[in-house]
Amino acid sequence: MKKNLTEIVFILDRSGSMAGLEDDTIGGFNAMIQKQKGEDGEAYVSTVLFDNHTEVIHDRVDIQQIQPMTRKDYYVRGCTALLDAVGKSIHHIGNVHKYAREEDRPEKTIFVITTDGMENASREYTYDRVKKMIQHEQEKYGWEFLFLGANIDAAKEAARFGITEDRAASYHADHQGTAVIYEAMSEAVCNVRASRPVSADWKRRVDEDYKKRNK
């Protein structure tokens, strides 16, 4: 394992229901990346955008080389093929690690999944298949998976993926809610990069904001 190297994979919803939140999403993502550039250790970043289809805009790019996301990268359209996005991403990163030299394999891996609605368009992967993939990576390699969902019961949906409740959070799909989830993502990623446990506190502000405004 390569010490102090973290594999970070962001799987971000850009389906049509995200309309109106483009600038908030772009701003939140860019602020998070900028903060992570100042943290200790190396990191490879993959950013996967999904609607009906999956588009990879960063494929294991050194975090210091990541350019700010723009409206050319992130625009909304289509439905929610979440299972395909997650399944393909796990398969790709898993294969890279499998065939990498031991000294090049990242010490830590974290996937951050965001969606503002239910899966409704995947054609290649099923819940059962993705759940087995996630559980395999969690148990054998210690990969972390976070699940942030709007307009759904995030904990319930995450469980279908094999992601535990303490790694899932519901949020409001608006300006404030989007800002809060990117701050939470950044905190969790910082913990993983520093080899600290991801405690339930990573999502405290997300939970507080959701409950306060969920009336």
Predicted regions and their residues:
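Acidic, low-complexity intrinsically disordered regions
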Residues: 1-215
